[in-house]
Structure formats: C-alpha cells, structure tokens
Amino acid sequence: MHLIFFFSYFLRRYLLLLCAILILRAPLAHSLIPPLTCVNTGTVESDVTGIRFDRCLDTDSLAKISLSTVMSKARVYTDVNVIRPKDYWDYESLNVQWGEQDDYEVVRKVGRGKYSEVFEGINMNNNEKCIIKILKPVKKKKIRREIKILQNLCGGPNIVKLLDVVRDQHSKTPSLIFEYVNSTDFKVLYPTLTDYDIRYYIYELLKALDFCHSQGIMHRDVKPHNVMIDHELRKLRLIDWGLAEFYHPGKEYNVRVASRYFKGPELLVDLQDYDYSLDMWSLGCMFAGMIFRKEPFFYGHDNQDQLVKIAKVLGTDELNAYLNKYQLELDTQLEALVGRHSRKPWSKFINADNRHLVSPEAIDYLDKLLRYDHQDRLTAKEAMAHPYFAQVRAAESSRMRTQ
C-alpha cells in the first residue's frame, strides 16, 4: 500500500513538472496568452479554449493551443458534422463501388486541371452524353473524399450529378462520370450577360453553396471555371469538388486551396480554422469580375501579391484590424510588400462599359461579401435574401405558382 501511495504521489508530481516544462517550451505566436493549468489529477485544462485533456499534452499540442488564442467557428451550420454519424463524413472508410469502364466511351477532350483531364463521353447503354473526369495519380484518400462528398450532395440544387465511378482494370486509374452540361466558356459568356442574367446566375450559384454548406461541406474552389452555365437552358452547375472538405468546428485546414485570384484573405494570412465563408469571398471575387467586367478582379502575380492587390482596394486599416482580431502577424517581407493603402471606393471601378450592370444594391451586396473578416461576410442564405435578388425571387415565386 505504501509503495502504491509513494508511486502515485511521485507520478502526480512528475506530471505537474512535465506540464510546466512543456508550457514554458511551447512556441508562442503572441505575448498575451492565458496560462495553461495542470491539476494534480492529471487533467489539463486550457483557459484559452476551454478544452479539457485527460493527460498532459505534448509540445505540438500546446503550441497549437497557444497559436489559436482566438478560435474561429462558422456562424452557420457549425455542428452539422458533429451531429451526423461518423460514416457521413469519414471518407477514409469509404468502400467505393466501381462501375464498368466499358459502359463509357470518350468522344473529345473538353478540359484539364491540376488533378484531372476532362472529356465529353457517351454512355454506351443509353447513348446519352456524359462527362468523364479521368483523375491523375493522387492519394486514394483525396479520391475517396471527392466521391464521398459528391454522393452526400447528390440531388442538391445546381450540384453537378455524379453518375458512376469506374477505373481502368490495368492501370487502376479512376474516372468519375458526371451528367453532361453544354457549357459556354465564361470568357465568351460573361461579356454578353445582362444585369438580370448576372442576378439570376449568382442566385442559382448561391442555392448550390447554401445547400453544400448546410450539408457540412466547403467547396474551397469557387471560380468561373467551376461554374458551368448552359445559357440556352439557363442551367447552372457547380462542379469540381476535388478540393471540397467536410467542416469540423475548430479544425485547422490546409491554406493551399482555391485558385489564386479567388483565395480569401484568411488563406493568404495563414488562418487555418476557416469555414464556409471562404466560398463567399470567392463568390464575391467572381461577382465583382462580372459586374465590373474586370476578370479577374484581384489580379495577383503570386500569393503575396494577391494580398497586396486586395489591400489596394479594401485598404490596410481593415486588414490590420482583421489581423489584430485573430492575433495574426504578417511576416516582415509581406508586411513591407503590402504597405499602407486607404480604401478605394467601389465607384472607382464604374465606367461606361459596365455602368448598366452596377446598381446601388449590387454595390451593397458586393461590399457585404468582400470583407477581410470572414465572420463579417454574408452567408449564402443571407445573400439570397439580399435586395439585389428581389427581382429573381419574385420571378421564381411566380413560376412556382404557375406550375
């Protein structure tokens, strides 16, 4: 009994000492960080996050808590994946049901990306057109994630429909089979769009975004290339879910997502606990390009220059307020590149060529999307209720009444 007592006593003292050493050694991003306490039961509680741990943490874990002094969480759909069963979001456990590759035949190449080549194809069973996305060699985990997300979103408004998943018997190269959309290149289409067309298609895109967000999924690559529009049928589809990810509150994500011109400030300043609002920034960049006829709207030559281009429009005062709120710091080189800029009024972008597309409500809507602080941006549902879309909502209500 005495041996057990002394062993227990010294173990508790050792754990307390170890916690103290680890806290002192943990790299601090900022000077004002509340201390961690380790009680003598072996439980560690962070005053920063309120998280309790059943043991003393290693250096990396403590460093992460220290760096995340202001935890950011999504304003909406925060706990979708907390409430859902694990098999909804656990894509690593997905057992892929492979179809028959011989059921499909390639007709012509229609595009290529970093992770895939895209072809128009034919379903040999029913002679219907389809899109065949042949994936380049990537981690199986990434392929499973895209498939799982597409399966979860199947049937959602304006989400491209996954029809089948096949793979080559010899090379094992996987291909995703999608519904066919007769899309016009956005560089050709956008300059022809009327004011109402832009309102209509942005509203349709918001339907897709609100749906995927409501299902606990961030797209993370919203851009014109990934928004297919069949203008004749007035049909829109949000495609390419290869970078999409399940949202878990407090989780730190890779900031190397989205295409440069559409990257949110959170990615450019290395804020990792971002959320669905990233998609709303990308949408805002798209929208600005459409109404001002300036594509891309923020034209950075690299990631650092991208932040510079944003700062020259939104100003550096609000950028600094954003950094201070989340206790982030730019490295010295980037800080020097960004410099100091006053906010540029949206009216400075209006000219004779785009005046007919830029209304007061369009400017107000844009201003509520392109915010440094991701928590200040409109959510997709809030955006759909904006006065900018009043005409579109009225037309949709009228159409539904006559059906």
Swiss-Prot record:
Reported consequences of knocking out the gene: No visible phenotype under normal growth conditions, but the triple mutant cka1, cka2 and cka3 show altered circadian rhythms and delayed flowering under long day conditions.
Chain sites annotated for binding ATP: V110, G111, R112, G113, K114, Y115, S116, E117, V118, K133
Keyword tags: ATP-binding, Glycoprotein, Kinase, Nucleotide-binding, Nucleus, Serine/threonine-protein kinase, Signal, Transferase
EC number, as in UniProt: 2.7.11.1
Active site residues according to the UniProt entry: D221 (proton acceptor)
Main location: nucleus
GO biological process: regulation of circadian rhythm
Free-text tissue specificity from the UniProt record: Seems to be present in all plant organs. But seems to be more expressed than CKA1.
Pfam families: Pkinase (PF00069)
Enzyme category, top tier: transferase
Domain Protein kinase: 104-389
Cell compartment(s), UniProt: Nucleus; Nucleus, Nucleolus
Signal sequence bounds: 1-31
Membrane-crossing segments per the record: none
GO molecular function per UniProt: ATP binding; protein serine kinase activity; protein serine/threonine kinase activity
Catalytic activity: L-seryl-[protein] + ATP = O-phospho-L-seryl-[protein] + ADP + H(+); L-threonyl-[protein] + ATP = O-phospho-L-threonyl-[protein] + ADP + H(+)
GO cellular component: nucleolus; nucleus
UniProt-listed InterPro entries: CK2_alpha, Kinase-like_dom_sf, Prot_kinase_dom, Protein_kinase_ATP_BS, Ser/Thr_kinase_AS
Residues annotated as glycosylated: N182
Purpose of the protein: Casein kinases are operationally defined by their preferential utilization of acidic proteins such as caseins as substrates. The alpha chain contains the catalytic site. The tetrameric holoenzyme CK2, composed of two alpha and two beta subunits, phosphorylates the transcription factor PIF1 after an exposure to light, resulting in a proteasome-dependent degradation of PIF1 and promotion of photomorphogenesis. CK2 phosphorylates translation initiation factors. May participate in the regulation of the initiation of translation.
Subunit structure: Heterotetramer of two catalytic alpha subunits and two regulatory beta subunits.
PANTHER family (alphabetical): CASEIN KINASE II SUBUNIT ALPHA, CASEIN KINASE II SUBUNIT ALPHA-2
Family: Belongs to the protein kinase superfamily. Ser/Thr protein kinase family. CK2 subfamily.
Descriptive protein name: Casein kinase II subunit alpha-2
Organismal lineage: Eukaryota, Viridiplantae, Streptophyta, Embryophyta, Tracheophyta
Gene encoding the protein: CKA2
